[in-house]
Amino acid sequence: MTKKLHIKTWGCQMNEYDSSKMADLLETTHGFTLTDVAEEADILLLNTCSIREKAQEKVFHQLGRWKTLKEKNPDVIIGVGGCVASQEGDHIRDRARYVDIIFGPQTLHRLPEMINQVKGTRSPVVDISFPEIEKFDRLPEPRAEGPTAFVSIMEGCNKYCTYCVVPYTRGEEVSRPSDDIVLEIAQLAAQGVREVNLLGQNVNAWRGENYDGTTGTFADLLRLVAAIDGIDRIRFTTSHPIEFTDDIIEVYRDTPELVSFLHLPVQSGSDRVLNMMGRTHTALEYKAIIRKLRAARPDIQISSDFIVGFPGETQQDFEQTMKLIAEVNFDMSYSFIFSARPGTPAADMVDDVPEEEKKQRLYILQERINQQAMAWSRRMLGTTQRILVEGTSRKSIMELSGRTENNRVVNFEGSPDMVGKFVDVEITEVFPNSLRGKVIRTEDEMGLRVVESPESIIARTRKENELGVGIFQP
């Protein structure tokens, strides 16, 4: 009988990536297959996020639902991972004694041993340690699921922004070696992946070891990834302005595989608030980065994170944020009302902005961003956009869907053989959350890099002399 695994994931793309690795790992070691139905599962894993308000209560609410499944079948194993697990540790079992496994983001690779221990001893396992980058050496080869893929290049963060729990839950910055990253991406490319998104809490802080023992920069890594056959688009998230150096900007100037879209969080337009947040950069320094980026790549579009209602934020501070939003002309944002995360310095600050004022500021900010995003979309009307076709449209099974370089979803009529390939689409309609277009050019007509295997080249060029000896002419 097939053993089944159910994983519920909350939070960032790093968590999504980690969950996919858990599934691959447990299929390899224990033969588990994924199921969307918790009631069918032999193992239930909750991959948690501690960024949002009331994260802990959300976890215990979900565990309460799973408790009934455990009562019906005591052999079901329940595990809690992710940042809440890292933050709370044994306290989770204080409130939920039926939880069998508690593991952190850096110990998910030990899940097979933890499961075996629970089955063998019927005793719980807690491992929320921070072994340096060990998990990547223990995970199976990557498996592609479509033409896009996420690849984690580093873990943790050293910035210690006053509102953020990441350094406490994922540890300090540790970079994967460049060879490991390039190998993983090459394996994905061999399975048909065309676009890769490099992941890290502070991705441009990557300083990984090269094959010769030297230390590479993030700009070096971007160029290495761009040279991999089959990879035609590169994205990365998330960046920090303080380490967005000129050598990265130069990659935008000379590397077309790097998309014309960047998520670069600023959080606030007020230097006073930025200082209280521990951001170590000013609004002017942020604008200088954007100015240099647009000199290197004039069509680049920028998105950001914003926190409104941070302790001590005045109306004038908020107006400076709105001024920055207009000056940079952000295309998109992830914006939130401040809520204190336990254990962070900001949790000890006086939360003196009234809740209604926070909500009003958030509404004003999001409305402005939405207006700017719509203006960006309208500029695309009548233009030709290169789309990576991801699959069937959510709006109609008779249509295909894909994304532009600037992360717009485009729906269009096409044939199934286009999935996983690029098409050029003329934008004919603009909607708030998507675009519509018509195909004007397929990948075969684009003249993209031709990727051939060594075997096909040898087969095509093999010759034999009069003695029957094979010779090869490239």
Swiss-Prot record:
Residues bound to [4Fe-4S] cluster 2: 157, 161, 164
Highest taxon in the source lineage: Bacteria
Binding positions for [4Fe-4S] cluster 1 per the UniProt entry: 12, 49, 83
Domain TRAM span(s) in chain numbering: 378-441
EC assignment: 2.8.4.3
Disulfide bonds: none
Signal sequence interval, chain numbering: none
Radical SAM core domain span: 143-375
MF (Gene Ontology): 4 iron, 4 sulfur cluster binding; metal ion binding; N6-isopentenyladenosine methylthiotransferase activity
Alphabetical keyword list: 4Fe-4S, Cytoplasm, Iron, Iron-sulfur, Metal-binding, S-adenosyl-L-methionine, Transferase, tRNA processing
MTTase N-terminal domain ranges (all copies): 3-120
Co-factor(s): [4Fe-4S] cluster
GO cellular component annotations of the record: cytosol
Keyword Ubl conjugation: no
First-level EC class: transferase
Reaction(s) this enzyme catalyzes, per UniProt: N(6)-dimethylallyladenosine(37) in tRNA + (sulfur carrier)-SH + AH2 + 2 S-adenosyl-L-methionine = 2-methylsulfanyl-N(6)-dimethylallyladenosine(37) in tRNA + (sulfur carrier)-H + 5'-deoxyadenosine + L-methionine + A + S-adenosyl-L-homocysteine + 2 H(+)
Subunit structure: Monomer.
Name this protein carries in UniProt: tRNA-2-methylthio-N(6)-dimethylallyladenosine synthase
Species: Cronobacter sakazakii (strain ATCC BAA-894) (Enterobacter sakazakii)
Gene name of the record: miaB
